[in-house]
From Swiss-Prot:
Recorded name of the encoding gene: psaB
Binding site for [4Fe-4S] cluster: C559, C568
Similarity comment text for this entry: Belongs to the PsaA/PsaB family.
Organism from which the protein derives: Gossypium barbadense (Sea Island cotton)
Keywords: 4Fe-4S, Chlorophyll, Chloroplast, Chromophore, Electron transport, Iron, Iron-sulfur, Magnesium, Membrane, Metal-binding, Oxidoreductase, Photosynthesis, Photosystem I, Plastid, Thylakoid, Transmembrane, Transmembrane helix, Transport
Annotated positions binding chlorophyll a B1: H654
Protein name (record): Photosystem I P700 chlorophyll a apoprotein A2
Cofactor details (free text): P700 is a chlorophyll a/chlorophyll a' dimer, A0 is one or more chlorophyll a, A1 is one or both phylloquinones and FX is a shared 4Fe-4S iron-sulfur center.
Predominant place of localization: plastid
Residues that hold chlorophyll a B3 according to the record: M662, Y670
Assembly information from the UniProt record: The PsaA/B heterodimer binds the P700 chlorophyll special pair and subsequent electron acceptors. PSI consists of a core antenna complex that captures photons, and an electron transfer chain that converts photonic excitation into a charge separation. The eukaryotic PSI reaction center is composed of at least 11 subunits.
């Protein structure tokens, strides 16, 4: 018999039903469960697949550069970044009629094009690219890196080049390599690029390979570096009248601490950014030399963990046993990596709009909205994944003997206290926030808006004031004009910071009021509830009072029959599944809030947000309905326009989202009956019954149907909001 899919599981390959296909897809990446897997092969497969991942990333970024160089308008955009719309790529569509061709021919293009809302134009411009030739060169270089990554991946699957398990478990060497070799050296290299190419570029000097060695990035060269007069590199920065990309008003400084924003581009000073990367580089280069490898100097991580005895014995045996637990569990390591990456991705979302690093990106409102939303959703998926792999660790890798009375075991020992506290916090936030919103809603409905309960966020305003925002009238720290911190700030450090905080033209420290207070607590409700579900899923993954032997059933099981008092819905996978819905809704509230507050800020009518955001009808009517009006007007006498594609996507997103409920609400029995009826009809229909199937059709399992439903819900949700976000913002601001 020929080898059937899946080859990695002979048991599944012999399954006579369509379960073979779906379970095969579901377990394709669960290398641990494959036939003939060894620890060594597991590590080697994952390692080699990383190179494949890198190849895909390099190919994708190469494609971005190539298509903009080929079909975009980068050179025209560089001449006038505020008024030329950046083109992502051309649209070739034989179905376009004349009205559609006209609607999508924008940005000075000869035919229909897509506008770029990703910020790549601003990024490439800021780092010194100026011509299409530059873009083509970058695309070719990344293509070369992509090929190199593929070769490296193939090479590390060859017997001679396969690393051993001991190599993968050498934590100190890996840490040193990642800290110094990847973070440290790449940050230093990036500082070099900024100082040698980007900063001269921002001052009208075009540095390329042909003149790279002739152009001094600083008039005094390396003299100040070797003589210890490093402050000379900060003298004579660009003036506030500097025109970006020209020598007009430019200075000679390369490493500064100006603070605030470049007045024309509304982005951080490039010389501040270079200084930041240099500091990061030095920090990580030092950090990467702290752990003991072949040279016998530095710390052993195991010794560090074993030596740490918590004060007063309140954490039992502290970190004893943790080193081997973490080092021998890929799921634990992946959980830690995903948790870190998730937090970083969310921080990227927050910082890209509040402290924009790329020239002119702050004035491209649609791009700002798209990037914020994109990074917050990505962060949500990554963070839920962290808890999923944490739960798998507890089921597959956790050894109670090895971790007796250490911090990990003690988390499990007092899990009831953790879960009940999270539950209490979620209930408190939910009832109080909803109570305030509903009360205010009723007051508005009865025509007595003055009876709303409006709470000023005084603690948050006090924190903003401490950082220098003066409009609230708190005389504290940096907003206290006669304090030492304020006076030092004017001269020594970040003189531009206080101006930036108090300017209303940027998104730094937005003025907040009762509407912000309410939505902040709604978001806190979502965050705490999502965390509750995820933490409970991981801490109960090994077992609970209801089902003490849960770990023997694996990560995802539907239930253990009707005889145990209801064991459905309690697998660790079910917790992940439920948490994703909460995560999506929470980030929905986050992005609604961000988007509405910024739309009113950009349009100059902040009072609309302030007045309408304190009650539910305000959100539904003045944010969702008002801003989706262009997307739901259907056919009109004006015909096609450039928002039509988003209107279609808005509808299509709703369709995909709604399809999810078909899988989520009706389960296996209904579909099995339906399938058997359809199979009966098929076998008795002339012509149709000439087509046979090798696998007997059966319904999806409960867990699989939930996954398919969840995927539709997530994808539909994000498609719908993406279309709404981009159309409502670009429709207003172009």
């Amino acid at each position: 018999m020929a080898l059937r899919f899946p080859r990695f599981s002979q048991g599944l390959a012999q399954d006579p039903t369509t379960r073979r296909i779906w379970f095969g897809i579901a377990t394709a990446h669960d290398f641990e469960s494959h036939d003939d897997i060894t620890e060594e092969r597991l590590y080697q497969n994952i390692f080699a697949s990383h190179f494949g991942q890198l190849a895909i990333i390099f190919l994708w970024t190469s494609g971005n550069l190539f298509h903009v160089a080929w079909q975009g308008n980068f050179e025209a955009w560089v001449q006038d970044p505020l008024h030329v719309r950046p083109i992502a790529h051309a649209i070739w569509d034989p179905h376009f009629g004349q009205p559609a061709v006209e609607a999508f021919t924008r940005g000075g293009a000869p035919g229909p094009v897509n506008i770029a809302y990703s910020g790549v134009y601003q990024w490439w411009y800021t780092i010194g690219l100026r011509t299409n030739e530059d873009l083509y060169t970058g695309a070719l270089f990344l293509l070369f890196l992509s090929a190199l990554s593929l070769i490296a991946g193939w090479l590390h699957l060859q017997p001679k080049w396969k690393p051993s398990v001991s190599w993968f478990k050498n934590a100190e060497s890996r840490l040193n390599h990642h800290l110094s070799g990847l973070f440290g050296v790449s940050s230093l290299a990036w500082t070099g690029h900024l100082v040698h190419v980007a900063i001269p570029g921002s001052r009208g000097e075009y540095v390329r390979w042909n003149n790279f060695l002739d152009v001094l990035p600083h008039p005094q060269g390396l003299g100040p570096f070797f003589s210890g007069q490093w402050n000379l590199y900060a003298q004579n920065p660009d003036s506030s009248s500097h025109l970006f990309g020209t020598s007009q008003g430019s200075g000679t400084a390369i490493l500064t601490l100006l603070g605030g924003f470049h007045p024309q581009t509304q982005s951080l000073w490039l010389t501040d950014i270079a200084h930041h990367h240099l500091a990061i580089a030095i920090l990580f280069l030092i950090a990467g030399h702290m752990y003991r490898t072949n040279f016998g100097i530095g710390h052993s991580i195991k010794d560090l963990l074993e030596a740490h005895i918590p004060p007063g014995g309140r954490l039992g045996r502290g970190h004893k046993g943790l080193y081997d637990t973490i080092n021998n569990s890929i799921h634990f390591q992946l959980g830690l990596a995903l948790a870190s990456l998730g937090v970083i991705t969310s921080l990227v979302a927050q910082h890209m709009y509040s402290l924009p690093a790329y020239a002119f990106i702050a004035q491209d409102f649609t791009t700002q909205a798209a990037l914020y939303t994109h990074h917050q959703y990505i962060a949500g998926f990554i963070m839920t994944g962290a808890f999923a792999h944490g739960a798998i660790f507890f089921i597959r890798d956790y050894n109670p003997e090895q971790n007796e009375d250490n911090v990990l075991a003690r988390m499990l020992d007092h899990k009831e206290a953790i879960i009940s506290h999270l539950s209490w916090a979620s209930l408190f936030l939910g009832f109080h926030t909803l109570g305030l919103y509903v009360h205010n809603d009723v007051m508005l409905a009865f025509g007595t808006p003055e009876k709303q309960i409006l709470i000023e966020p005084i603690f948050a305003q006090w924190i903003q004031s401490a950082h220098g925002k003066t409009s609230y009238g708190f005389d504290v720290l940096l907003s206290s004009t006669n304090g030492p911190a304020f006076n030092a700030g004017r001269s020594i450090w970040l003189p531009g910071w206080l101006n930036a905080v108090n300017e209303n033209s940027n998104s730094l420290f937005l003025t907040i009021g009762p509407g912000d207070f309410l939505v902040h607590h709604a978001i806190a409700l979502g965050l705490h509830t999502t965390t509750l579900i995820l933490v409970k899923g991981a801490l109960d993954a090994r077992g609970s009072k209801l089902m003490p032997d849960k770990k023997d059933f694996g990560y995802s099981f539907p239930c253990d029959g009707p005889g145990r008092g209801g064991t459905c819905d309690i697998s660790a996978w079910d917790a992940f599944y439920l948490a994703v819905f909460w995560m999506l809704n929470t980030i929905g509230w986050v992005t609604f809030y961000w988007h509405w507050k910024h739309i009113t800020l950009w349009q100059g009518n902040v009072s609309q947000f302030n007045e309408s955001s304190t009650y539910l009808m305000g959100w539904l009517r003045d944010y969702l309905w008002l801003n989706s009006s262009q997307l739901i007007n259907g056919y009109n006498p004006f015909g096609m326009n450039s928002l039509s594609v988003w209107a279609w996507m808005f509808l299509f997103g709703h369709l995909v989202w709604a399809t999810g409920f078909m899988f989520l609400i009706s389960w296996r029995g209904y579909w099995q009956e339906l399938i058997e009826t359809l199979a009966w009809a098929h076998e008795r229909t002339p012509l149709a019954n000439l087509i046979r199937w090798r696998d007997k059709p059966v319904a999806l399992s409960i867990v699989q149907a939930r996954l398919v439903g969840l995927a539709h819900f997530s994808v539909g949700y994000i498609f719908t909001f993406a279309a709404f976000l981009i159309a409502s913002t670009s429709g207003k601001f172009g």
